[in-house]
């Protein structure tokens, strides 16, 4: 029975692909292979690597490849950088466990790193996208960099990458289930009700049946945690946007006041009403003559 490590919030992706058989099926689908020797797959996930409180990565050694699979609900161009750091730690552990000498005159042979990002966010993305560490380098793009890390991002939202889904039933079921939850939320159901209904529907349709029968409560807890994390990040972004908008308006009002303009004149210049500007205007006037931005901001937050 799949159990969730209580030291972190696991992701549904990790629960679905927790077993070696399921992980090998995903590997075969991604690589177009047909391996059946799941016991040869060695999982070596770094258990202390947690992103935003959520554990959403799986790494494993198989067929001379060092694989890093990560599920993402946001489009993140910094995945290659994270992959570089992750692979460095994995290779360090691999070298130590195999007692290899990096100072030897002999060439040390290493497993080939492969980084796959499984994307199921709401932002529109292509079915397949290549992300490179070198895209972040500030130097000339034609200059030869000493380091590179490439991540292949696959869009696994329901309806995308159909051929890949046909090759891996568990990936199809994962995508179908996530879509079922989202449909429930879009229909106006509470998140908890949407998850419950998606689970009931999945059991009826035979989607993720074994996992849901054995771990219904665990799956529900994990999905609620994931969606709450998404909502938190969305709220943080929205709050940041709103703060930036207000600070920009404060700066404009300060400039107008220094030019001797009244509240009415400023409102006319900004094409708004005095009522909409009054609170900020009064906070700015209170901070005269220094007009300290942070003091003005704190004054507005108190109000």
Predicted features and spans:
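Elongated, amphipathic alpha-helical interaction scaffolds
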Residues: 1-303
């Amino acid at each position: 029975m799949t159990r969730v490590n209580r030291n972190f919030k696991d992701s549904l992706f990790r629960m679905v692909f927790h077993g070696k058989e399921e992980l090998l099926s995903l590997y075969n689908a991604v690589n177009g292979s047909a391996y059946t020797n799941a016991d040869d797959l060695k999982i070596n996930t770094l258990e202390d690597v947690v992103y935003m409180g959520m554990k959403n990565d799986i790494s494993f050694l198989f067929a001379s490849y060092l694989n890093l699979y990560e599920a993402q609900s946001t489009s993140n161009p910094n995945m290659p950088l994270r992959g570089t750091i992750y692979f460095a730690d994995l290779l360090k552990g691999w070298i130590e466990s195999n007692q290899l000498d990096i100072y030897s005159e002999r060439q040390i042979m290493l497993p080939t790193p492969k980084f796959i990002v499984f994307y199921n966010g709401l932002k529109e993305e292509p079915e397949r996208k290549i992300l490179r560490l070198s895209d972040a380098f500030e130097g000339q793009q034609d200059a030869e960099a000493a380091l590179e890390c490439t991540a292949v991002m696959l869009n696994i939202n329901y309806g995308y990458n159909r051929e890949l889904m046909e090759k891996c039933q568990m990936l199809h079921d994962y995508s179908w289930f996530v879509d079922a939850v989202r449909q429930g939320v879009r229909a106006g159901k509470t998140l908890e009700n949407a998850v419950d209904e998606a689970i009931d529907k999945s059991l009826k349709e035979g989607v993720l049946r074994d996992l849901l029968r054995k771990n219904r409560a665990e799956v529900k807890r994990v999905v609620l945690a994931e969606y709450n994390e998404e909502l938190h990040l969305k709220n943080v972004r929205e709050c940041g946007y709103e703060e930036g908008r207000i600070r920009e308006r404060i700066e404009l009002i300060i400039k107008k006041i220094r030019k001797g303009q009244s509240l009415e004149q400023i409102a006319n210049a900004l094409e708004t009403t005095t009522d909409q500007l009054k609170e900020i205007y009064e906070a700015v006037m209170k901070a005269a003559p220094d007009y300290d931005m942070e003091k003005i901001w704190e004054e507005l937050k108190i109000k």
